[in-house]
């Protein structure tokens, strides 16, 4: 929490840190007071017992606002937390199978994949070939096709089956509701 406040507070110059000759001033109520000298703006903030905060340093002249700086930092950190909450992290879950997998085992793996997809995660299915099994890549394609057939109502193919080294990989994404 404290580090977030420090990050936010470094972005804004306040009170004596503002060395501009002229600034565009906004009062604590949000009223435009126009362009005033930096000293006058600081004096007005002191009279109101509030802080002078430079909101937009790149503007000509820079925009400053008279406000309670502590409250401003609190509001900014609250906005950042709210924005973070709204971001959904999509993870990729991997399910590994061998080319000699039995039908029942494949069904169980498909059920697990379905749970992941319903939770909103992507699923990466890997068929791992060992030794001479790599010569029979068509078996891997059959396995991935039967896997997909069991899940077609809850997923879409993001990346079709492709042989990468000794692994055949297919990535499934949840269907948009």
UniProtKB/Swiss-Prot annotation:
GO CC terms, sorted: cytosol; membrane
Quote the InterPro entries the UniProt record gives: T_IF-3_C_sf (IPR036788), T_IF-3_N_sf (IPR036787), Translation_initiation_fac3_CS (IPR019813), Translation_initiation_fac_3 (IPR001288), Translation_initiation_fac_3_C (IPR019815), Translation_initiation_fac_3_N (IPR019814)
| Keyword Protein biosynthesis set for record | yes
GO annotations under biological process? ribosome disassembly
- What compartments host this protein? Cytoplasm
Cite the entry's keywords alphabetically. Answer: Cytoplasm, Initiation factor, Protein biosynthesis
Task: Specify whether Metal-binding is a keyword of the entry.
Answer: no
Molecular function (GO) terms for this protein are: ribosome binding; translation initiation factor activity
The family assignment reads:
Belongs to the IF-3 family.
Alphabetical list of NCBIfam families matching this protein: infC
Q: Which HAMAP family match?
A: IF_3
Subunit text: Monomer.
The record's function comment reads: IF-3 binds to the 30S ribosomal subunit and shifts the equilibrium between 70S ribosomes and their 50S and 30S subunits in favor of the free subunits, thus enhancing the availability of 30S subunits on which protein synthesis initiation begins.
What is the recorded name of this protein? Translation initiation factor IF-3
Q: Which organism is it from?
A: Clostridium perfringens (strain 13 / Type A)
Name of the gene this protein is made from: infC
